[in-house]
Each structure stands twice: as structure tokens, then as C-alpha cells.
């Protein structure tokens, strides 16, 4: 219990510090802010190991396409994977709910790194250009796109069906899908 609280304290303080330190990067090239995201991924990995003795095992990195566009469909069980996946994939673009951009400082960084937003609860005109944005990002930058198909954090034992958007991305864009399973919610 105490170790968990110490972990949370240092993780959140470190995350806030990294975001604040990278505020000046918001006027610099995008890649600088992307590096900040990767640092956050390594920070959470360090905190998990140092404070909780959690070792992270990643299996199947040899299946990540090297020379073609792809997208990642990942389960979403905690805040962990949103940071950690940035240490595995080459500066991914996240598809995320629009509301996250309203978070001061953090939302500014999400916007700067080129996150693709979607209004989850309603069909809006903003969502119509969704697939065009994905095509543009992947073809122009060669960055993979990460989507959380259940559209919300889900406990490991909860089986929530995937949203239709994932299959539509696969059908419309003809990109390879790299599925990611995890157990970070335990």
C-alpha cells in the first residue's frame, strides 16, 4: 500500500515536471515534444521497477512492420500503456477523445505531437475527416497510429466489445494492424 502511494507520488510529480520542462518545446519542432513523450514512457518504466519491483516483458516486437504503414489496436487498461507504448513504437500518433486536449499543459503537448481527436459520444462534422487525417499522418510522417478499440480504459476481466472504427480503419485504409494485448490493469 505504502509502496503504491510512493509510486503514484513520484510518477505524477515526474510526469508534471516533464510536461512543464517541455513547455518551451511547444514552439520548437514537433520531434522535441515527441522525445518528451518517450521520456515519459521510460519514466513510468523506471518508477514501476524502482518502487514496485515490476518488470515489464514485451513479446513479439519482431512482428512490428519495418517498411510499411500500420496501425496499432491496443487494449487500454491504465494510464501506463499510453506512455509506455511510446518506447516500443517509433513516435506513434494517438487517436484519442477530444476532451483530453482541454487538460492544461498535457493537452497542449497532445496537440503538438499530432494526436488525432474524435468526439466519442456523438457523430460530429469533426469526425468526418477522421480517416483522411490518419492517411495523411501515416503517409506523410510514416508514424504508426495507436487506437484503443474499446474507446475506454477497461479492467482485464471486463469484456467490452470493440468500436466499429477499428475495423473501418482496417477496411478503408488497407493498413496492417498490429494487435497489442496487455495486462497492465492488474
Give, region by region, the residue ranges found by the protein language model.
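Catalytic core of membrane glycerolipid acyltransferases/transacylases, capturing the structured
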Residues: 15-29, 34, 38, 66-123
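Residue-level preference for the first positions of well-ordered beta-strands
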Residues: 69-71, 142-148, 176
